[in-house]
A protein has these predicted regions:
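Short, solvent-exposed loop/turn segments at secondary-structure junctions
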Residues: 42-44, 117-120, 135, 157-159, ...
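A structural signal for short, well-ordered beta-strand segments
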Residues: 115-117, 150-152, 222-226
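Catalytic core of non-heme Fe(II) oxygenases with the double-stranded beta-helix
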Residues: 126-192, 233-238
Length: 317
């Protein structure tokens, strides 16, 4: 006789619904300024769990069967697919306040399309200068599609914070912006969004923003990307498969609502690319390290076989 299916406790932390006045204020500020700081989304316990899981990924470069960070530039260590790491990362993405504010700003067809973070290293270089985030095919766009990012600091950020020019959103198609173009903006329109660990904010990515300069101490932060998946993507992001379907951890997906499942893209293959392979070739060192690793495995196998042969010879005596 078959036993009843095992039931598991709910995993998704469902906070109380936010007061409507809070939602209204956040939506109004986001529409007016392009950016809004959200009231506390998570507990200190949740934050510690997220920090610990994130720090483990930052201990080493990703290699073979070792999980870790990716590094494609000098000043950042990238952690992809953070929804795999800890329950808190999922809870933040699906927080009732986040969902309500974004749905009123973007409409009801939005999804979470990307969830990653990085450790920014100290530098005085303005390596990630003023820009709006390019993501859609501007040749097909009749207007400026809206996209919102949720940012959360995992460390106290006293320098190198997100800088944002209030009211610069939905004015032009996103592009790199030169420093000389910024001088015409009043200083009180340029905000430096410093804050303690756990600070969360939403911003329209078409607005002009950058990572602040200088970065005096390491900064850990996560960034979630929400937009309508039906908007045609720019070719660069298709080639890189940037907006692939989310990678999720089944342990963190208990008690999801239908809306949560839609936001996480359950069953949506719009931007799925079968048998995707990146067109660029890996660097020379990639093949070199792979060859060295293969040689080490063969040497280990040889040592085991020699040891086994010696044991047999010893027993024979």
């Amino acid at each position: 006789m078959l036993s009843s299916p095992r039931k598991f406790a709910s995993t998704v932390n469902t906070p109380a619904l936010p007061e409507q006045t809070t939602v209204d204020r956040c939506v109004s500020e986001l529409r007016a300024n392009g950016v809004v700081i959200l009231p506390g989304l998570i507990s200190q316990e949740q934050l510690r769990g997220m920090q610990n899981a994130f720090d483990v990924r930052l201990r080493r470069l990703r290699w073979n069967n070792f999980e870790g960070y990716q590094r494609t530039e000098i000043y950042r260590h990238m952690v992809e697919d953070v929804l795999l790491l800890d329950q808190g990362f999922v809870d933040v993405a699906l927080h009732p306040l986040v969902k309500q504010v974004i749905s009123r700003y973007l409409g009801n067809n939005f999804e979470l399309n990307e969830a990653k973070g990085w450790k920014s290293l100290p530098t005085t270089r303005d390596f990630h200068g003023w820009h709006g985030d390019a993501w859609y095919d501007q040749g097909q766009a009749q207007e400026i599609p809206k996209e919102v990012k949720l940012a959360m600091y995992l460390t106290d950020v006293r320098s190198g914070a997100l800088n944002y020019i209030k009211g610069s959103h939905q004015r032009q198609h996103p592009r790199p912006v030169k420093n000389f173009e910024i001088v015409d903006y009043p200083k009180d329109q340029i905000i430096d969004l410093t804050g303690p660990a756990g600070t969360a904010l939403l911003f329209d990515t078409s607005g002009i923003h950058r990572q602040g300069v200088p970065m005096l101490e390491p900064r850990r932060a996560i960034f979630y990307n929400y937009h309508d998946p039906e908007v045609p993507l720019q070719q660069e992001d298709i080639d890189y498969y940037r907006y692939h379907p989310l990678l999720l951890n089944a342990a963190f997906l208990g008690n999801l609502t239908e809306e949560d499942q839609r936001i996480l893209g359950f069953g949506n293959k719009t931007n799925y690319i079968p048998a995707f392979e990146r067109s660029m070739s890996p660097p020379v060192w990639y093949n070199l390290f792979g060859g060295i690793h293969g040689a080490q495995l063969r040497l280990r196998e040889l040592r085991i076989r020699i040891a086994d042969r010696l044991r047999l010879l010893t027993k024979g005596k």
